[in-house]
Design a protein with these regions (language model features):
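Flanking scaffold residues of small Cys/His-coordinated metal-binding clusters
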Residues: 2
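Cys/His-coordinated zinc-binding microdomains
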Residues: 11
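TOPRIM metal-binding catalytic domain and adjacent DNA-binding surface shared by DnaG-type primases
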Residues: 14-93, 101, 110-124, 181, ...
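Phosphate-handling DNA/RNA-contact segment within nucleic-acid enzymes
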Residues: 71-184, 200
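Short, aromatic/basic amphipathic alpha-helical patches
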Residues: 198-208
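Metal-dependent DNA phosphodiester-chemistry modules and their immediately adjacent helices/loops
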Residues: 218, 222-241
Length: 241
């Protein structure tokens, strides 16, 4: 028998055997990890990758994207990466990282807030996406109040009463309560799959379904960036409106 695991941040996965075995004595050295803040300005490799995804340099800078070399565990190599910053009062406290050559992911620090939340105009419609690239795609299309959840989607809707003090998976929602309460409408733009739909339902359940609209993506598209790349801005506008 074994237990399988999967990390939604770096996409590491595997299995651990449950068979009892004798473990050798291993000398352990304490290691301290620090969040890296000195990422590079956007380079050609990053800008080229973003352009293929429909994102301009102007939008990339507006949303604070950076470049950097980073070791990607799943690829077992150092790669050119795009860096998605998570900020608090203008200071980056964590970052999600994606290689631009291969589809590899990593994380620096622990994202705990909405991505792009500090660029939101309070009192306007708020667009909640499942991934950073989807939020950036909406910004590219003129929807400046687009944010992304910090964690991966939930697998299923869970019934029962919600206690904000114990709702750790959705703490980012409660931390942004003043912005959410002030928004005219909440447009939920999660992925078009079971997990994305469950995430959208859980978000709406916490905010209040009377204030939420859930986007339905066109056939053949699973998220906002997919629509932008395959069908263009006009189709994004049609879906969002």
């Amino acid at each position: 028998d074994s237990i399988v695991y999967n990390c939604w941040h770096c996409e590491a996965s595997g299995g651990v055997s449950l068979q009892e075995r004798q473990m050798p004595n291993v000398r352990r050295n304490k290691v301290t990890l620090a969040v890296k803040h000195d990422w590079d300005d956007l380079n050609e490799a990053t800008l080229s990758w973003l352009e293929k995804r429909g994102i301009s340099e102007e939008t990339a800078r507006e949303t604070g994207l950076k470049s950097g070399k980073h070791f990607i565990s799943a690829l077992q190599k150092q790669s050119d990466c795009v860096v998605f910053p998570y900020t608090n009062q203008g200071r980056m406290y964590a970052a999600k990282i994606r290689s631009v050559e291969d589809k590899g992911f990593s994380c620096n620090g622990s994202p705990a807030s909405f991505f792009n939340i500090e660029n939101v105009v309070i009192g306007e419609d708020l667009y909640i996406c499942e991934g950073e690239m989807d939020a950036i795609s909406l910004v590219q299309c003129g929807y400046e109040n687009a944010v992304s959840v910090p964690n991966g989607a939930v697998m299923k809707v869970v019934d029962g009463k919600i206690d904000p003090k114990e709702d750790n998976k959705f703490k980012f929602l409660w931390d942004a309560k003043n912005i959410i309460d002030a928004a005219k409408k909440i447009i939920i733009c999660t992925d078009d799959d079971g997990a994305g739909q469950a995430m959208g339902e859980e978000i709406a359940r916490r905010i209040g379904k009377d204030k939420c609209w859930i986007v339905e993506w066109p056939d053949g598209c699973k998220d906002a960036n997919d629509v932008l790349v395959k069908k263009g801005k006009k189709e994004v506008d049609k879906v969002i409106y």
